[in-house]
Amino acid sequence: MVVKIGIVKVGNIGTSVLIDMILDERADREDIDVRTISSGAKMGKNQMDDVLPKIDEYNPDVIIFISPDPGAKSPSSARETLSKKNIPTIVIGDGPGERAIGSMKEQGLGYIIVKADSMIGARREFLDATEMAVFNSDVLMVLSTTGVFRLIHKTLDKVIRDIDEDKLYSLPELVITAENAVDAADFKNPYAKSKAIAAYSIACQVSSMNVRACFKTKDYHVYIPLVSAAHEMMSAASKLAYEAREIEKSNDTVVRTAHRRNGSILYGTSLNDNKE
């Protein structure tokens, strides 16, 4: 069986950029087929009304819905629509999505909340396309190196495998913290693990600062330093994450979990260990 995965991206968080790619990093898995539909940067009602019906044309076996703040008005409306499709659906969101956990459970939806996938400093005077790209590259460094992406793909792989084998599946109810992220990263060096925990924890704090700057402060002289400081924090988190991986590389203990063609995992802990 080939499991058909429909991914609906509404708006953008850091995880959105690579959510489809982390399931099939070399584009050679034979057990899945993926289609991604995106609303682009916007996440209003018009975008929802246009995007959601298109996923039905693909007839997926499982749906992944990813957006900022799944509890916000438009994503909440989309969740309500998806919950009625009788298709296993997993919602992926950032930290504010924790407030929607209760309603997602009631709707029978799975969820993965990535607390370190923090809101960007979206003030026009500060955020241009270059700054946006730099911020997202820092976020991706944190999410990839601290173990977030590995934890996500392992979680989704289990659902895919259960559907493929026609087993009784359970949808994930996962809030990603520094601790369970670095456990998935499987650091061998304690200093590398400590740096990764620090990176994730700093990244989590970025969102509250940007929320204050973007929604709770009107004074230019207050909110510009706040968004700039928040981006500096994410940059610092990225550097710590990079340093954590460099420590593991220097000890030849970087853990790799590559997908085989059949979707199973090829596990290696030394650069020369990854042999089929």
Swiss-Prot record:
How would you classify this enzyme at the top EC level? Answer: oxidoreductase
Q: Which reaction does it catalyse?
A: 5,10-methylenetetrahydromethanopterin + oxidized coenzyme F420-(gamma-L-Glu)(n) + 2 H(+) = 5,10-methenyl-5,6,7,8-tetrahydromethanopterin + reduced coenzyme F420-(gamma-L-Glu)(n)
Give the GO molecular function terms.
ferredoxin hydrogenase activity; methylenetetrahydromethanopterin dehydrogenase activity
Q: Which UniProt keywords apply?
A: One-carbon metabolism, Oxidoreductase
Which Pfam family, just one, is annotated for this protein?
Answer: MTD
Q: Which GO terms describe its biological process?
A: methanogenesis, from carbon dioxide; one-carbon metabolic process
Report if keyword Oxidoreductase is assigned.
yes
What HAMAP family does the record tag this protein with? MTD
Q: What is this protein called?
A: F420-dependent methylenetetrahydromethanopterin dehydrogenase
Q: Which organism is it from?
A: Methanosphaera stadtmanae (strain ATCC 43021 / DSM 3091 / JCM 11832 / MCB-3)
